[in-house]
Amino acid sequence: MSTLPQQDLNLNNVPQAKQQKPKSARKEILSWFLTIAAAVVIALVVRTYLFEPIRVDGESMTDTLQNGELMFVTKPEYIWGSPSRQDVIICKYPNRKEYFVKRLIALPGDTVEIKYDNEKNINTVYVNGDAVDEPYLSQSRNDRDNSMAPLTLKDDEYFVMGDNRDNSNDSRYVGALHRSQIVGHVRLVFYPFSTARAIP
């Protein structure tokens, strides 16, 4: 019976797997810290420049939005573009930290006016002399008289109103907003799931 040469049986020639040294506690903590910091930075960038989920707080946009619903708000289009009339937007008011959700009614250079019909008990908004078609308003509303004299917006001034006109603190009371106060465009409601829908 043949035998293998002794050198072929030498286990010292067999490659040995290198064992990875365990990380020190300091390196482990640093790794976790960097991971968390990166996640926070990414989240801040996304919320500041891309999109943000925001909860409706209040009834100023009924029937378009309901109290407690979660909205998906996009931001890039207002960073590189301009808002349009009828957009549902997220905005900030002077000297207030919280967000507000309103509808954009008039743009810089527009003249906005509100006339009250005593027979029908409704207010009609006019922009540049034309009545604004507002199908999103409640058809059974019984408005208070919120008539307003013609107001011509200056450069970088935007006029916003809530869809629930008798229960909305908006440009009729706080004045026109500046472009820097418009945060994003409400695109859809995603919660509750049963009422998820796009916002035109």
Language-model region placement:
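Soluble "head" domains of membrane/secretory-pathway proteins
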Residues: S2-I29, V45, Y49, I54-R55, ...
